[in-house]
């Protein structure tokens, strides 16, 4: 049987159609608070002598009020509404937190982890890092999250939460997502 131009176009057209569907079906998205670019970074936060910050942020990315970064004490697993200030001190390879009421009295953090291990990466201290990769019925994917602490030139604390994920749907179509949200906590003098 002699092949014609139309019969040769069949496999080529099918391949082109498949590639077009894959290109349109794959994708990435990135959500980043634009105000992050306005933050003027300072030197690495020095917590060796201890530093006290407001527990509530002076700025918080939209929709993050109930998130981990919605209050500084939540980073250490404490959800007490009476906490007004958090003092963070660097001890060995851990950041240790002390919690204070408005009148300066200490608030005990029963049943919580009032310290976190950290790693230094450039001018940032990284805590709460985790990742997970798993296969599933529809494909395979990975998710990750980390919380970065840094200081501004005004010596305020910036807590940035970076989350992301990637998936290979049907082991063919790649998709990815990354989200960056943050809160700024003012450095204050400890309440007496």
Indicate where each model-derived feature is located:
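Short, intrinsically disordered, charge-biased short linear motifs at domain edges
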Residues: 13-18, 39-40, 119-122
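Predominantly extracellular/secreted and cell-surface proteins with exposed
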Residues: 81-135
